[in-house]
From Swiss-Prot:
Key words, A-Z: Protein biosynthesis, Transferase
Gene symbol of the encoding locus: fmt
A single cellular component GO annotation: cytosol
Protein name: Methionyl-tRNA formyltransferase
NCBIfam families: fmt
Annotated EC: 2.1.2.9
Originating species: Phocaeicola vulgatus (strain ATCC 8482 / DSM 1447 / JCM 5826 / CCUG 4940 / NBRC 14291 / NCTC 11154)
Cross-referenced Gene3D superfamilies: 3.40.50.12230
Enzyme class: transferase
Length: 324
């Protein structure tokens, strides 16, 4: 079979999914349909509809687009079936019902942003950085009933530097993911795929780390942890959705403070956890049990994101100021 004869349906929504679709199109594959989320109401009163990044790219390429509200809707199922896909590819989309992923003769594969079986779930990149991992990766695997558990097709390992935040790791994986999707389709086309069950990669001593969805309360900083854990937590949520805390000032008021970039300072001290140390010009540090978190970039509620020097120009300190 030639590339142009392989009928592919692609499913994805955010920026992360655009690169893989782009590689398929530029690689000469026949993408007969793109499934993405419905346009999102934006602006005042939801008067403006914002298409997904995948839709924007698909429109620019003249690809056929389907935007179902419900993936089990009979009209959508019939339209999807009419595309006569040989293969479906899923990148950062939704959980698919079996009637959808079982439809094409060559199956449906997913690109997942971790080295499966580690970090099954919705936020694998965040959790790898939060946990201080020095390596992550991307995996292509065939879908089956249980989420993120199907047989592995291919994997690529990617280092995580100590200074990488989640945005940097996201972008590394996004571009390498495009390569891996293309390599996986090539392998399926030439019949060289030998899928590996995830169970065969799990040893008795293996600790499987989950990657659950991240909510606002997940992002609250626990200052009772150590310097390294807090540092990794902040970069694992930067720039989005952003780690946050409450800044408590002398008059008893509290303000939500998002923290984007920090440095580790290991030191002995006699300050209380959460107390603030600052010269009011160049540094703003939070005391933790084994040192300080030196805050470099931050944002008060209702204000723009700024560096610490700009923040300190408008900041008033007292002995009672702290974060918690």
């Amino acid at each position: 079979m030639e590339k142009k004869d392989l009928r592919i349906v692609y499913m994805g929504t955010p920026d992360f999914a655009v690169e893989s679709l782009k590689r398929l199109v530029e690689g000469g594959y026949n993408v007969v349909g793109v499934i993405t989320m419905p346009d999102k109401p934006m602006g005042r009163h939801g008067s403006v509809l914002q298409p997904s990044p995948v839709k924007e790219y698909a429109v620019s390429q003249g690809l056929r687009i389907l935007q179902p509200e419900k993936l089990k809707d009979e009209a959508f199922i019939e339209e999807l079936r009419s595309l006569q896909a040989d293969l479906q590819i899923v990148v950062a989309f939704r959980m698919l019902p079996e009637i959808v992923w079982n439809m094409p003769r060559l199956g449906t594969f997913n690109l997942h942003a971790s080295l499966l079986p580690q970090y099954r779930g919705a936020a694998p990149i965040n959790w790898a950085v939060i946990n201080g991992d020095t390596e992550t990766g991307i995996t292509t695997f065939f879908l089956k009933h249980e989420i993120d558990t199907g047989e592995i097709i291919q994997q690529v390992r990617v280092p995580i530097a100590d200074t990488d935040n989640v945005e940097i790791v996201h972008d590394k994986l996004m571009y390498l993911g495009g390569d891996l999707v293309l390599e996986t389709v090539d392998a399926i086309l030439n019949g060289s795929v030998k899928p590996v069950p995830q169970e065969s990669l799990i040893r008795q001593e293996t600790e499987l780390r989950p990657a659950p969805k991240i909510f606002k309360e997940t992002c609250r900083i626990d200052w009772n942890k150590g310097v390294k854990q807090i540092y990794d937590f902040i970069r694992g949520l930067s720039p989005y959705p952003a780690a946050w805390t409450e800044l408590c000032v002398a008059d008893g008021t509290r303000q939500v403070l998002k923290i984007y970039e920090t440095e580790k300072v290991f030191a002995s001290h006699e300050m209380n956890i959460g107390d603030i140390r600052t010269d009011m010009k160049t540094y703003f540090q939070v005391a933790v049990k084994d040192g300080f978190i030196n805050v470099l970039t931050l944002q008060l509620a209702g204000k723009k994101r700024m560096n610490v020097a700009d923040f300190l120009r408008g900041y008033r300190t007292s002995d009672n100021n702290k974060v918690e």
